[in-house]
Amino acid sequence: MVHLPFRYPRLLLAGLLVSALSPASAKFDAAEVYTESPGVAAHFPVPEAVSFTTPAFAEGKKDFTSQREMESFIREMAASSPALKVRVVAQSQEGRAIPLLIFTREGYDSPQWIAKNGKPTVLIVAQQHGNEPAGGEAALMFAKSLADGKEGDVLSRVNVLIIPRANPDGAEHFTRDLANGVNLNRDHLLLASPESRAIAQVLNSYLPDVTLDAHEFSVAGRWVKKFDAVQGYDGLVQHATTLNLSRPLYQAMAGAWNTALSQAFKAHGLRDSVYYTTDQIRLEDKTLSMGGTGPDALRNMAGLRNSIAFLLETRGVGIGKAHFERRVWTQFVAMQSMVKQAAADPQALMALTRDVRSEVAASAGKGELMVKGKATRGKHEVTLLNARTGAPMTFEADWRSSLQIAAEITRSRPWGYLLAPEQQAAVDKLRALGVEVYRLKQSRAIPVERYEVASLEQGQKFDVTGKVGATGNKMTKVTTTLVKTELTGTAGYWYVPLSQPLANLIVAALEPETQSSFVANGVITLPSASEKAGSLPLWRVTENISTLPDLF
């Protein structure tokens, strides 16, 4: 993580030299914008008595905030606010800076100090998708409010971290994916891009108690084609919904935190719903789906890291700059609400996340875990707006709910996993995720379960939107059976214990049957195509070996 001391202009110039060469205007094409009917537009008036001072709202500006404008805005904030420090956590694939804004009452930015200052930390990540600018603009707006002291004394009770633009290349080109075609919000387990690795580093270093991931959803497009309607909600919200989440954490998200967000929207005259989408490729399929259950989205990855975690989506994709004030205001209200909720009882929040981390680490070798699951089907009432008249259209839709996950594969929770010595790529990714991995110094006979490969086939990943991204849609579908055995000659093997707070993240990475796993994505070596059967270089440890002397 490169420290960027904004108070020293020469160092700032050096740190942002590559970014400063980018053009002043983002490549937004107004000709591709969907124009709403007057009846639809009437549902989304400009918020009253709200001042919008971020770069996209400059008089006469027709596009969105450029990289250069964002950096200049941040620089001016940092120069005027002792509470704000800024670090550049990475350079994008095309060389643009990814800044992290760190707000503390005392003006410190050290992860070690923040971990000891007795306050919970809220992380806001915006614009993982480059063509979803409202989240990034609201992040700047909320940062400005914090910098100017307009959020009261919240910094006496919480720390706030903001990544206002996680995908600066996508923002510059006004495209959803990263420069290499990867969907950043499906890359938080595999870490195939510098952008996802940067976010992982922030998560590892600062251990946020609360994480908010800010996006925008498609307004027209497939909604018009399928329903002759457009989306009518201001904001769609969903907490983490993935396999093996801590029950107390899940209950807190589904209860008080969900309620706080919804009440904040209603208090400002904004319409909200649980998040849902529909397949953009199979237009004959009118099923509506909540956000997925995979561990690769930031919302779910943060949950597996024992953080209160929410996805926020506001209307925006495809409508250009229409209703931009209202879209940004909706995002701002959510960001403010999350910080206020954290500040309302900071000690209780810290106790919750501390207890969850301890509970997860203490679960090694106990009970069952869900290896593979799927959302359950049902019905759900939603309201869209007639695309021509704007009249509300309320109906009961076929629904795929991530709030109830149906188990497809369950297994006993092991004490940990062993990886063969040559599986360095998997070890490196686990460590980049913040996982503790140890190398065995001595050979011992270790009771294990071996993964025998029953079948291998190439397939396409499932995504509730129809595709993962421009790339990253393919995977190897693996089925295995477990064979109890004893592994000998283990000196040099890698041991990944589940007696650590990231245990459920480890399970998501190493159990082979899901589309996000290291096995399905080729990080862990598969048997060659010529082998009719084989085993994986990965074993489940069935007894506690952490207490064996001189093993590590």
Give the location of each predicted region.
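Structured catalytic-domain cores with a bias toward divalent-metal coordination
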Residues: V2-Y8, A26-F552
